[in-house]
Amino acid sequence: PNLTEYLKEQGLGVGLISTDSLSSQTIAAFSSHTSNEENTEEIILEQTRSGVDLFLGSGRDLYRRYKDNFISESYSYYDKFENIDINQEKIIGVFDEEKDETTSKTIPTLDKLTKLAVDFMENNFPNGYFLVVECGHIDKMSHNVNILDMVQYLENFDKAIAGTYESLKDDPTCAIIVASNHETGRLVYNGETK
């Protein structure tokens, strides 16, 4: 079993959220067993049977084809953030792909996704849960060596973590771990700027 399957076997809740598509590498690694990140259909079909309690991210147009698969596995399926009812057993929320500021198509900000996810997990899993929060666009902007946009996404990630810390800081059983899976774009701080 993968980590999330093991945690489900232990009776814990599992939530996976990202600003990127839910079929992207990080989320797929926690919710499928495919050996190729380009096996999108296989990833999504495995996600429907994964037992993950909460999926939030982008990919609405892609996931629409699999809506019935998720519903048949007891997921409440949402494609509008404002319609999500956290009083459900399992949720998948898939939103518009991330776009530039010239379009109206954007997924909810990471801090909003994270707050909803924490509320859902806290309400439904009193014995504990595992929540992955990914800002996939930090990596994308770094690949493009777009430092300004990368910093904006990093600030939103920081806001999401700060909000989570504030809501959970009095819980002695909670651990918040912040990690990077790799560096891209050769971003280097030289220590000279203020």
Regions found by a protein language model. Name each.
Residues 1, 5-8, 12-25:
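Mobile, glycine-rich extracellular loop/lid and propeptide segments
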